[in-house]
Amino acid sequence: MAMRKILVDETNRELCEHGTVGFPMTVNHDDLWAFEGKSVPIHWHNDLEISLPKEGEAIYQVYQKSYTVRPGDVLLLNRNVPHSCHSPNNSHARYSTFLARPDFIYGEYGSDVERRCFRPFLQNSSVPCILLTSGNSCTRTVIQKLNETEDLFDQKTFCYELKIKGLLCEIFGMILCEHQNDLAKFVPANQLELERLEQMLNYLNTHFESIISLQELADQIHLSREVCCRLFKKMTGKTITGYLEEYRVNQSLPLVQSCQYSMIQIADMTGFSNASRFARAFHRQFGCNPGEYNSLKLQKC
């Protein structure tokens, strides 16, 4: 079975369009074990995202904070927010993901719905996500309506598009009203920080095969090395070294799976200084050595 992969550009912006031009929303039935490395690497997109756990635990990294979501919880991710996802101890985690373009829900930009209801969330850097926890009556109602939305999307009966839009308006109305006090603490989104992160990710992803110095990276965004490190950590929750190691290991997967190269060759092709460092980094991420990866993967199919 082919492993799923989030397709991104050099800045880690997701390339996949969610839904269609005429109906810009979709529902994915996700399983972390179906993704390469049993995790979703850091990425971001312009759409709103809701995660509805079905089985197991998933840990979302949003900026510097981790959110553990379980069945009975709901996580709403704001647009343009870098995020990643993994499960503790590589355990199974199944969840449904709802993705929608914001204007599909609020309609015309500048309308009262966009300006009064959505703008305090969409342009608020202090609310990158909203976690609805189990045991709350609002959460239970939201889950019920998300399940209705999922059923309609899967069955695609007559007028399912209209019914889904109505349900999404109800869902977002409940979530935003429930967190009205949080939205009142408005901090305008810092577009410059996102642009600088894009520049750093672009440089790291383009030059991962080479030795990259922190000074080189800092020079790309005209900041000191210290500020560069703080900004990267703030926006991704990861250190630059940790991100680069993870990215290099992910880039090594197709080479490992091809069985055409030695560990020394793969280490050299993916920017590791030697095979031992590559093997250790691979083991940290996947829990096995590169040589064991293919056989273990076959056993679990």
Feature locations, PLM:
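Hydrophobic/aromatic-rich alpha-helical bundle segments in the mid-to-C-terminal region
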Residues: 157-159, 163, 182-190
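Generic protein-terminus/edge-of-domain signal
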Residues: 1-74, 80-81, 89, 114-116, ...
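Ligand-binding loop in jelly-roll beta-barrel domains
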Residues: 80-103, 110-113
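Amphipathic alpha-helical segments enriched in hydrophobic/aromatic residues interleaved with Lys/Arg
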Residues: 114-167, 202
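Solvent-exposed, amphipathic alpha-helical segments
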Residues: 56, 138-155, 196-207, 251, ...
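Basic/polar phosphate-binding segments, predominantly the helix-turn-helix DNA-binding elements
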Residues: 174-179, 199-249, 261, 265-296
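Linker/hinge segments immediately adjacent to helix-turn-helix/homeobox DNA-binding domains
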Residues: 169-185
